[in-house]
Amino acid sequence: MKIGNYQLKNNLIVAPMAGVTDRPFRELCLRYGAGMAVSEMMSANPKLWKTSKSKQRMVHEGESGIRSVQIAGSDPQLMADAAQFSVENGAQIIDINMGCPAKKVNKKLAGSALLQYPTIIEEILKAVVNAVDVPVTLKTRTGWDTDNKNCVQIAKLAEDCGIQALALHGRTKACMYKGEAEYDSIKAVKEAISIPVIANGDIDSPEKAKFVLEYTGADALMIGRPAQGRPWIFQEIHHYLENGTTMDELPTQEVKAIMLGHVNALHEFYGEYLGPRIARKHVGWYLKEHEQASEFRRTFNAIDAAPLQIEALEGYFDNVAS
């Protein structure tokens, strides 16, 4: 699949997730089969660009793969400025967030709250597309609530405004992440527009990935929460789509190597104070299927020193192996 002039190595994309899809996680997912990874959203508020968190999000030098950066906001000019700032700092694709259902984002009339206001959406899309010379994509939801699903209208508007690919999550804003994603709306959008459509929502297995692609006719899949603690899910899905067979479960020692590599990368990227704290949630995701890990997770979450975290993980896997 192509977005503008950029050819993805496959049609599996890492969804932007605040506090998750930082550079270490993106690099890991790309290594294990993702065709592209979208960065966590950056606020269009320029007052926040100078914070240490925003500066870290803008570190793209030497990053592998296509650099897609997501921006969020509701003011057309500020969104245009944020897009330009992102491109100046290495973004090759700009993604506009109109899908986040979080109250923190929606109370500022950003994310999926914008779905109530197509006129503002049009102003934002035109402003961003006209502000940069790179492809602009849009991530959104099926509508505001089940009685107000306007994704086909928004998709047509996006195409008319010059958006070059659209990712659609199969839930409304009101649904948050409850219940199950539905794919009829994604199918309807795919039938209504000619730009690439990327299906998103509950794609948590190779079999589900194949079903969603075939049912919706989507050009690509975007995977978010199922990749938390399982970045190799992209490899599993790609193998299944290519060969029709499922891969064997990764050996425990390989999972250990992936996790230790990820935790070390977090320590290096964020430093000795923040790194161990951010590593905690990732380790929790990696071990969520381990029945024997609940007590270990409580112990691990109390460890503040990076070397002690590595030592604890080594010890945990030694115990599992024995």
Swiss-Prot record:
PANTHER family: TRNA-DIHYDROURIDINE(47) SYNTHASE [NAD(P)(+)]-LIKE. It comes from Vibrio parahaemolyticus serotype O3:K6 (strain RIMD 2210633). The active site is at C100 (proton donor). It is an enzyme of class 1 (oxidoreductase). Its EC number is 1.3.1.-. This is tRNA-dihydrouridine synthase B. It holds the Pfam family Dus. Its cofactor is FMN. Keywords: Flavoprotein, FMN, NADP, Oxidoreductase, RNA-binding, tRNA processing, tRNA-binding. It comes from the Bacteria. It catalyses: a 5,6-dihydrouridine in tRNA + NAD(+) = a uridine in tRNA + NADH + H(+); a 5,6-dihydrouridine in tRNA + NADP(+) = a uridine in tRNA + NADPH + H(+). Belongs to the Dus family. DusB subfamily. GO terms for molecular function: flavin adenine dinucleotide binding; FMN binding; tRNA binding; tRNA dihydrouridine synthase activity. Catalyzes the synthesis of 5,6-dihydrouridine (D), a modified base found in the D-loop of most tRNAs, via the reduction of the C5-C6 double bond in target uridines. HAMAP family: DusB_subfam (MF_02042). FMN binds at P16, M17, A18, Q70, K139, N200, G201, D202, G224, R225. Transmembrane segments: none annotated.
